[in-house]
Amino acid sequence: AAQATACRIANNIIRGDGELGTAGNAIHLWSSSRMIVRDNVVSGHRDGLYFEFVRDTAIENNVSEDNLRYGLHFMFSHGCSYRENRFLRNGAGVAVMYTHDVIIERNEFRSNRGPAAYGLLLKDISESKVDGNRIEDNTVGLLIEGGGRLTIRRNTLARNGWALKLMANSPLNRIEENVFAGNSF
């Protein structure tokens, strides 16, 4: 959807079988606001969910699995919430980039593996909350690069290569009450 307002994308099964050079995104939102993306299953695409310049949108109870790149690729999109989604076996995991005021709660990021893969990447993101998520069996569990004033609380990071990579350009974060179990680093 492009330049859409107050629409609902719900209860769909969207399967792809493309290769990286030809595959598109399953659900692609651009310059949209007040959207609801709920109860979808997407697999086999370039990116399962791709959002750019999206505002005030709720992403809830979706499954994004076996995509070539990202389960979710999210940029320049403010005031959005991600709750109770499952991101499984994607090529690179989930990337939330260049944004602020995001809530990421009670999601599962699992088995996103590869040379540049992570469960969840927070890049140049601020004033956001990551709470109650399960981040398990990823190359890197949680990578924070250029993230500031984040609250990372009550997450479980288990059986990842690196549990948490926090880069030096990520100041003023609160990381508390998390469980780290069985990670390599």
Predicted regions and their residues:
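Extracellular beta-strand/beta-solenoid scaffold signature
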Residues: 1, 20-31, 44-50, 66-73, ...
